[in-house]
Amino acid sequence: MKRIFSYNSFRMILSLSLILGSIGIASAASSTALPDPNRIRYKPLSFEPPRAERLRLENGMVLYILPDKELPLVKIKVVVRTGSMYDPAGREGVAELTATMMGTGGIAGMSGNAVDETLESIAAAFHASVNRDSGILSFSVLKKDLDRGFDLFSRILTQPSFEEMKLTLAKDLKMEELRRIVDDPQKLAFREFGRLIHEGSPRGRVTTSASIRSIQR
């Protein structure tokens, strides 16, 4: 009985100590007045956004060049006026599949796997994506490998081969994603909201399994 009483007493004392300590901390915190934000003084902030050089090529393409010598890395981003809203009726999803295939489908004279291996060998990275009204193709490579990397990047942009096997895989993955959309209520709600709000407009069209199956090389 003495042992039980001692244990219970210890638990009670410990609990009271914790409660009193918490009250003390809360009281101390509440007694510390916060400074008036209107009376806070600080040095004026100085910021000058970097200025990019703007060039227009003979073909009408506009370039923005911004040197940054902090790292020996060259980053290139190409923005194209395209997107899912320009997909032909009945072939919704073609813009997204095109972006996927740009990164995996290979180029003339080189398979997709060979392109991946070459990019990895020079620590370069390529990524393509599209939204409703634009497409973005990004590339980064070390300065010492710029010539080799830029040659490969330009071939990806101008000579994609869209391997049949990689296209079939991309279509299967997209159709599986569409099948599983009912498992994500938020994603499903956004899709249906876009369909309703833009009803009758190209922006209101949605990708379906049937439209994906209709896409061929």
Predicted regions and their residues:
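Proteolytic maturation boundary segments
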Residues: 4, 25-65, 73
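Bacterial N-terminal signal peptides
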Residues: 11-24
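Scaffold signal of the M16-like zinc-metallopeptidase fold and its non-catalytic homologs
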Residues: 29-37, 106, 149, 181-217
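M16/insulysin-pitrilysin zinc metalloprotease superfamily fold
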Residues: 104-110, 140-173
